[in-house]
Amino acid sequence: METAKSSIIKFPSPRAKTPQRLRQADSLKYFNHTQIRMLRRAARDRAELDFKKGKVTGIREWMAIDLLISTGLRVSEAADLKCSDLKLGYGESKIIVNEGKGNITGHVVINDSLKKHLKHFLAWKEEMGEPIGEGDPLFLGQRGQWTAQAIQQIVKKYLKALKLYEPGKSVHALRHSYGVELYAKEKDLRAVQKQLRHLSIQSTLIYADVTDESISKQIKGLWQ
């Protein structure tokens, strides 16, 4: 049984900024709240248009982009997801991540909006005749399971169309954007560490050092 003493976890103070952390924060590449909303809207609009036309590309792309934005998953983790990694039953709202950094199996908690989207996506896949059982890939195209490189190119395509792309600021910046936004919402480093599955809280502290004006005030919900 856990004692009161053992349950106390001491974290480094976010205010104790070292020169190295300040340099990391200054170089952190992420998209602000408005830019993320633009990306979401563009991908969602493309999905709705493709659905009306009986096409499938935009539907898959919107799912991938929404997943990355709403979870902070690494692109390789998103590409490796199996349908059975989605725990969407009653009382469950999480995604199992089997090969995160450090080769440790973990999970990310998801919000109701993403849970609903994933459920609809699985139902759509089934209607399209795609397998959604144990071990079946979540993202499956005409050439097989999507690769991390394929998802990177999808994100890059949308960013370029929105004039948001710049070298070094692409798909992984979505993970940083999630970390920045999540910390701005509740100022809870432990929550950010758990969601991003950082092995050390030191990796998470960088998000506490970002002081961009766009994230200086509390928000009611992520990307809503």
Model segments located where?
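Conserved catalytic core of the tyrosine transesterase superfamily
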Residues: M1-Q224
